C-alpha cells in the first residue's frame, strides 16, 4: 500500500466525536491541556485577564456545591507565582450552542465563594466590541468576580500568532501547539468561524432596498450588531495571517457605550442604506474604512492619507501612482487640494496612469491628501459561501489590503544634504596656487546659486 494513503497519528484526534456534549468536553480538555503544556500560549491567554507570569495548571469538570445543588463548570485554570495565585472557572460552548445567563450566574456565585478571580467563557459568539460579553448577567454578581469572553476565532488566532510569529522556545511545545491548531481548524472540532448574519438580515436588506426601513423595525439592531461582529472577525482572521494585532477603530464613546455605536450604525442604515466601520493595521498609511452599501449592492474599502509636502501637483500624483503598480486599474483615486470644499478631482487608476493631470482640479492649489478606494460587488445571502454578504466583505478587505494598502508608504521629507569641501570655489580654480586663492566656501553660496537658477 502506498504511504500516501496512510493517516498520520494526531495528538488530538477528531474521530469519534458524537454530539455536542462530547465535542465540548474534547475541545475544553484539549485547550486547557495545551495552555498548561505550552508556556507562551498559556501566558498569552491568561495574562490579559490579570494572571501573574507563572506555570498554568488546568483541570476539567471540577465539581462544586452551591447551596443544595451540584455545579460542574467545564474547567478551572490556576496560575501561581510565589505567594500570588490567580484562578478562573471556564465555561465552553462549541458549534451553534450559546452561553446561558443563568448558568454563568451560578458559576459567578461559585467563584465568589471560592475566592476565584474570574469566570472565562469560550464560544463561537463574537461580541461586536472587544471586552463586551455576549451574555447578559446580573451586574451585581460582577462586583467581586470578573467575567471575560473569548471566541474560538480569538483562541485560534492567538495560537497561530504565538506559533508562527511570536514563537515558542521549546520545539516539543511548538509541535503540541501546532496539534491544537490542527484540531481547532477541523470542522468536527466545533470551533466555527463567523458564518451567519442572523434571521433578520434578509427582511432588513429588502426594506433598505425598498426605502421602507425605520429605526424601530424589528431586527435592525441585530443586523447592526452582527456587522460590527463581522468586522471583529475580519480583524482576527487578517491579524492571524499578518502576525500582528488588527483592531476595529472605535471612538472612546463607542468603546464605553456600545449602545451609542449601535444607534449610529442603525441611523446610517436607515438614512443612507449603508453599514460602515474601520479597521486598523499597524504600520499602514491609514485606517481602512469599510462601507457596505445595501442599496447599491457594493462593498467599498478606502484609505485617506497625506500627499507629499513638496513638488508640483503632477509630481505628487506620480508619487502615488508609482506605488500602485500591482493595484487593479479600476481602483479610484481622489485628490484633495488645500482649502477645497466638497469632493476633490477623482478618476480611475487606468486613466490617471495615462494622464495624471485629470486629478488636478486647479494647478494653482496645492494637493494636500489622497483617497484610494476599491469597490466590489456585495453578496446578499445571510450565511457563508458564494454570493454571501459575509464572504463579500471579507474578500473585499483582504483584496484591498493585498493589492493596494500593503504597497502604500507614507511620504517623508528627504534629509538635508551636507556639502563637501570639494564643492568650494577654490577647488574649481585649477592651476591657481593655494596661497593666491581669495575665495572660500560660504553658507551664502547656495542662496546665490538658487537666485541664479
Model-derived regions: residue spans:
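Charged, terminal alpha-helix-loop-beta segments
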Residues: 1-453
Amino acid at each position: 500500500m502506498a504511504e500516501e494513503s496512510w493517516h498520520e497519528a494526531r495528538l488530538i484526534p477528531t474521530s469519534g466525536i458524537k454530539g455536542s456534549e462530547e465535542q465540548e468536553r474534547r475541545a475544553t480538555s484539549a485547550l486547557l491541556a495545551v495552555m498548561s503544556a505550552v508556556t507562551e500560549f498559556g501566558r498569552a491567554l491568561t495574562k490579559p485577564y490579570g494572571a501573574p507570569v507563572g506555570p498554568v495548571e488546568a483541570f476539567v469538570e471540577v465539581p462544586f456545591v452551591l447551596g443544595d445543588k451540584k455545579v460542574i463548570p467545564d474547567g478551572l485554570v490556576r496560575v501561581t507565582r510565589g505567594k500570588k495565585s490567580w484562578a478562573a472557572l471556564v465555561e465552553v460552548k462549541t458549534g451553534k450552542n450559546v452561553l446561558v445567563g443563568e448558568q454563568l450566574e451560578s458559576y459567578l456565585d461559585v467563584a465568589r465563594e471560592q475566592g476565584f478571580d474570574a469566570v472565562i467563557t469560550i464560544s463561537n459568539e463574537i461580541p461586536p466590541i472587544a471586552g463586551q460579553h455576549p451574555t447578559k448577567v446580573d451586574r451585581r454578581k460582577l462586583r467581586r468576580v470578573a467575567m471575560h469572553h473569548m471566541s474560538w476565532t480569538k483562541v485560534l488566532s492567538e495560537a497561530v500568532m504565538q506559533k508562527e510569529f511570536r514563537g515558542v522556545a521549546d520545539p516539543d511545545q511548538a509541535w503540541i501547539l501546532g496539534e491544537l491548531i490542527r484540531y481547532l481548524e477541523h470542522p468536527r472540532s466545533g470551533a466555527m468561524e463567523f458564518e451567519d448574519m442572523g434571521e433578520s438580515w434578509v427582511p432588513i436588506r429588502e426594506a433598505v432596498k425598498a426605502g421602507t426601513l425605520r429605526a424601530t423595525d424589528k431586527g435592525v439592531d441585530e443586523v447592526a450588531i452582527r456587522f460590527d461582529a463581522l468586522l471583529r472577525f475580519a480583524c482576527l482572521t487578517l491579524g492571524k495571517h499578518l502576525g500582528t494585532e488588527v483592531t476595529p477603530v472605535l471612538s472612546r464613546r463607542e468603546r464605553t457605550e456600545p449602545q451609542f455605536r449601535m444607534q449610529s450604525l442603525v441611523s446610517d442604515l436607515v438614512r443612507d442604506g449603508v453599514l460602515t466601520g474601520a479597521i486598523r493595521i499597524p504600520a499602514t498609511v491609514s485606517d481602512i474604512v469599510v462601507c457596505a452599501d445595501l442599496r447599491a449592492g457594493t462593498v467599498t474599502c478606502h484609505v485617506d492619507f497625506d500627499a507629499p509636502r513638496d513638488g508640483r501637483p503632477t509630481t505628487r500624483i506620480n508619487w502615488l501612482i508609482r506605488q500602485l503598480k500591482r493595484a487593479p486599474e479600476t481602483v479610484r483615486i481622489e485628490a484633495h487640494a488645500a482649502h477645497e470644499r466638497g469632493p476633490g478631482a477623482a478618476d480611475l487608476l487606468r486613466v490617471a496612469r495615462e494622464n495624471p493631470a485629470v486629478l488636478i482640479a486647479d494647478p494653482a492649489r496645492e494637493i494636500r491628501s489622497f483617497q484610494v478606494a476599491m469597490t466590489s460587488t456585495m453578496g446578499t445571502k445571510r450565511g457563508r459561501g458564494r454570493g454571501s454578504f459575509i464572504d463579500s466583505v471579507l474578500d473585499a478587505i483582504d483584496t484591498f489590503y493585498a493589492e493596494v494598502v500593503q504597497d502604500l508608504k507614507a511620504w517623508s521629507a528627504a534629509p538635508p544634504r551636507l556639502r563637501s569641501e570639494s564643492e568650494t570655489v577654490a577647488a574649481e580654480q585649477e592651476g591657481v596656487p593655494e596661497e593666491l586663492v581669495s575665495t572660500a566656501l560660504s553658507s551664502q553660496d547656495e542662496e546665490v546659486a538658487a537666485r541664479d537658477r
